[in-house]
Design a protein with these regions (language model features):
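Extracytoplasmic gate region of multi-pass secondary transporters
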Residues: 36, 222-252
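Juxtamembrane intracellular "pre-TM" segments in multi-pass secondary transporters
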Residues: 2-12, 195-225
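Cytoplasmic helix-loop-helix junction between adjacent transmembrane helices
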Residues: 110-149
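Helix-loop-helix hairpin linking two adjacent transmembrane segments in secondary transporters
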Residues: 145-193
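Residue-level signature of mid-helix packing/kink "hotspots" within the transmembrane helices
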Residues: 33, 61-69, 153-154
Length: 252
């Protein structure tokens, strides 16, 4: 299907969709920095080193990487909307879990939960933008998508550190969890804008290639290289968890 044959989509609908996707994406990036601004408080609260706290970030991003790969298949099967809602709910749950944590290992557990929630956003966002936004506005859509992600990064320390200073790090994380669920509620109100028929569009007169299937991407060498790198990181981390637990940063 060419640009000329695509049905015209009202600009207002595209703007609404781009705003909703951008809002969700900002929470994804916001949640990537849930813990980092609170490291000074968490270090004292759990009697751990900055190296151990840094490991929580590694856990989060490794899980996100793996889930992002797998969630693309789920989005293709179920559509982006339910996957997006699940991701936001998991991020909110993880923030509340962090706030209630009583041990380092509880923080590690909820880092996994947050990583799963964070891993769904790019497959969801790119599917919605590519399938629903008119081609003439794709540049604007991806620009807003990137900008809102950066704004989410900026918001996290600006919101969490003052709340931790005024109240406590637990209150700061509870507010972060509430924010995720507020955004989820907004997206639920506008859920029809996020609906998508996952029946694959077919080009008129185009022959179907029986050799192309869902797993055809596994023929690409770069995919296997990426998998090898991720597995290497996982193995290295598995052998170093115990060592990191015993590591304390040397005085400056």
């Amino acid at each position: 299907m060419t640009t000329a044959t695509l049905p015209t989509r009202p600009a207002r609908e595209d703007v609404t969709l781009i705003a909703l996707v951008g809002l969700a994406h900002s929470i994804s990036h916001f949640s990537q920095l849930l813990l980092a601004p609170l490291f000074p408080w968490l270090k004292d609260a759990f009697n751990v080193s900055y190296a151990e706290l840094g490991l929580l970030m590694t856990i989060f991003f490794v899980v996100s990487c793996v889930v992002q790969t797998l969630s693309g298949f789920v989005v293709d099967k179920l559509g982006p909307r339910p996957v997006l809602f699940a991701g936001l709910a998991l991020l909110g749950l993880a923030a509340f879990g962090f706030s209630a944590s009583q041990s380092y290992w509880m923080l590690a557990l909820f880092s996994v939960v947050a990583g799963v929630g964070n891993g769904v956003f790019h497959p969801v966002d790119y599917t919605l933008i590519n399938r629903k936004v008119h081609p003439s506005r794709l540049g604007h859509a991806f620009s807003v998508h990137g900008i809102t992600g950066s704004l989410g990064w900026a918001l996290a320390p600006a919101m969490l550190a003052p709340l931790a200073s005024l109240y406590s790090w637990r209150v700061a994380l509870m507010c972060a969890g509430a924010l995720a669920f507020v955004v989820l509620a907004v997206l639920w109100v506008y859920r029809e804008q996020l609906s998508l028929d996952m029946a694959a569009p077919k080009k008129a007169g185009a022959a179907v290639n029986d050799n192309e299937h869902t797993l055809a991407f596994l023929k690409i060498p770069a995919v296997w290289l990426g998998i090898a790198v991720v597995q290497g990181v996982l193995i290295v981390n598995a052998f170093n968890v115990g060592k990191v637990r015993r590591t304390a940063l040397a005085p400056a």
